[in-house]
Amino acid sequence: MNRKYESIIKHLNKRNIQGYYADTAEEAREIAVSLVAEGDLVSWGGSQTLDQTGIRKTLFEMEKEGKITIIDPYGTADPAESMEARRKGLFSDVFFMSSNALTVDGELVNIDGTGNRVAALTFGPKKVVVV
């Protein structure tokens, strides 16, 4: 890991955010999924990164194995059901999301359409994993 990433992680830690570094999408997936405990209730906000890294796929596999329960706000075409799932996701044990940007000073930049990611980041879930 180069000095720039070490510095960013140090700045995240100063903000009470545990930072991790991964060289590959596979490493990022392994780190992220390791933060989920058996029996956890898991949800997420809209994030292409979760799909590109295979995190959501792995979480669905964990659910099929009976290890976790998922609240999927995007698993329905019904807008009312989707909104209800987003609200319920705020009470999850682990909430996955991605930020729009991360500054070198360890600041997360978030712009959100419905507000569920930003709401989850600031209040609600027991643990938030930003990928």
State where each predicted segment sits.
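The feature marks the mature, well-folded catalytic cores of soluble enzymes
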Residues: M1-V131
